[in-house]
A protein has these predicted regions:
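Alpha-helical substrate-recognition element adjacent to the catalytic core
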Residues: 2-101
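Acidic, Mg2+-coordinating phosphoryl-transfer loop and its flanking beta/alpha structural elements
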Residues: 126-163
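Conserved Lys-Pro-Asp/Glu-containing loop-to-beta segment of HAD-superfamily phosphomonoesterases
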Residues: 109-137
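Short intrinsically disordered terminal tails
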Residues: 1-2, 163
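Short, aromatic/basic amphipathic alpha-helical patches
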Residues: 84-94, 115-119, 141-146
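Surface-exposed amphipathic alpha-helices with a cationic face
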Residues: 55-62, 117, 139, 143
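His/Asp/Glu-enriched short active-site or ligand-binding loop at hydrolase and phosphoryl-transfer sites
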Residues: 97-110, 134
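Residues at the C-termini of beta-strands that transition into short coil/loop
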Residues: 19, 103-104, 153-154
Length: 163
């Protein structure tokens, strides 16, 4: 069975550093504004350092015969917001992500990871699951079940691929 290294990356303030931030009561309006392009995504706010580090992991794993699957895992209240994120990523980092996932809340991220990993285990042997997310609650939940999980700043500066 082929080995696979699973990576899950959050979008907001992990993969993309937002210029604008909003309160929870404004969240729906901002979802719509980004979703309909009233606030455009800009490539300069993409976390290029994170992308480069993940590409290095992909290459190192390839040399060892390990497949790497990179997945976006983001929270979205509206489908137009999700589509605008994925369209932006397809444009600026084509073929970087293997799969895009959207969940309705941060609490749904861990169950989504577990469900997708279970599906992947039908064909592959998972050697590691790495979660990169700016949300402490998400990383703590993932660490509690044995996944590697960290904030983007820590990942970019300190993460080393294990042997």
């Amino acid at each position: 069975m082929q080995k696979v290294f699973m990576i899950y990356i959050d979008f907001d303030d992990t993969m993309y550093d937002h210029k604008y931030h909003w309160r929870f009561d404004e969240d729906f309006d901002y979802n719509i504004m980004f979703g309909f392009g009233k606030i455009p995504y800009e490539e300069k706010y993409l976390n290029h350092e994170l992308v480069a580090k993940v590409k290095n992991i992909i290459e190192e794993n390839r040399k060892k015969g390990i497949k790497t699957l990179v997945n976006l895992l983001t929270g979205c209240r509206t489908s137009v917001y999700f589509v605008s994120k994925t369209n932006f990523l397809d444009e600026v980092v084509p073929e970087f992500f293997d799969q895009y996932f959207s969940v309705s809340s941060q609490e749904d991220k861990l169950p989504m990871i577990q469900a997708y990993n279970k599906k992947i285990e039908e064909e592959y042997e998972i050697v590691n699951t790495l979660v990169i997310d700016d949300g402490f609650g998400v990383t703590a939940q993932c660490q509690d079940v044995g996944y590697e999980a960290m904030a983007p700043g820590y990942f970019e500066k300190h993460y080393e691929l294990g042997e």
